[in-house]
Every structure is written in C-alpha cells, then in structure tokens.
C-alpha cells in the first residue's frame, strides 16, 4: 500500500478523521477490503482532499450535506468528527442540516440531526 499518494492521503485522513479510527481501518483491511481502502485513501484523501481549491472546513460542510442527502448516517457520524477537527462549529453543522432539510427533504435532515445530537452528546460527555 505504500506510495506517495497513499501516504499523503493517509496523513490527511488521519488529521481529519482521527488517527485511531484510520489506523484501525487500515490495519483491519484484508485481501478483500484492502483495494477499497487503498482507493479511498489515495484518491479521496490523497487527491481530492489535498486539492487547494477548498479549505478543509468547507469540504467537511459539503460532505455533511451530501451524506445527509444520500441518507448515510454512519458516514455522517464519521464526518461529524472530521468537521469538528476541521474547525466547524456546532452552529455550522446545524446550518447545513437546515439547508439540507429544504433542498434534500426533512426526513433526511432529521436522520442526520439524530446522528448529530447523539454525536454531540458523546463529545460533550467526554469533556465533562
């Protein structure tokens, strides 16, 4: 798995999603799942996320909107952590959910809101 694009992607992925999560995903890859891990790390993180056109905060907000539209709650939860790591506030995230409610549908936004509420409760309980 070692090449320059992979290493760059791995670094960005760790910075955004957290090293513990990423390292576990990569280390648990087997012959079946490794090709997808490589693809995601190299092209999603090493190529697209590394581009200079948008900052990471903006990319995180866009991801949350798209994942809400696609109704992908597991990915929403993962990218909520990334959004915080990239400087997004709880208010920024709520604004994305309000925007998606109008353009993607209230049910999709409500599902993401439930995920976000649970996520923020976990984060806040760890801070106490």
Predicted regions and their residues:
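Acidic, glycine/proline-rich low-complexity segments that act as flexible tails and inter-domain linkers
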Residues: 1-57, 85, 111-128
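A short hydrophobic/aromatic micro-motif that marks alpha-helical segments and, especially, helix-coil
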Residues: 33, 70, 104-105, 120
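Mid-chain, well-packed structural core segment of small domains
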Residues: 61-64, 68-95
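Substrate/cofactor-recognition hotspot
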Residues: 106-110
């Amino acid at each position: 798995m070692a090449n320059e694009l992979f290493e760059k992607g791995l670094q960005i992925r760790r910075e955004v999603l957290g090293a513990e999560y990423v390292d576990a995903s990569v280390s648990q890859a087997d012959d079946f799942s490794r090709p997808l891990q490589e693809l995601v790390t190299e092209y999603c993180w090493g190529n697209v996320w590394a581009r200079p056109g948008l900052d990471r905060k903006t990319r995180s907000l866009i991801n949350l909107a798209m994942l809400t539209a696609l109704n992908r709650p597991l990915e929403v939860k993962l990218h909520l952590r990334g959004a915080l790591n990239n400087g997004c506030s709880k208010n920024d995230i709520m604004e994305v959910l309000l925007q998606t409610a109008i353009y993607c549908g209230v049910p999709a936004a409500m599902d993401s809101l439930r995920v976000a509420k649970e996520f923020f409760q976990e984060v806040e309980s760890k801070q106490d």
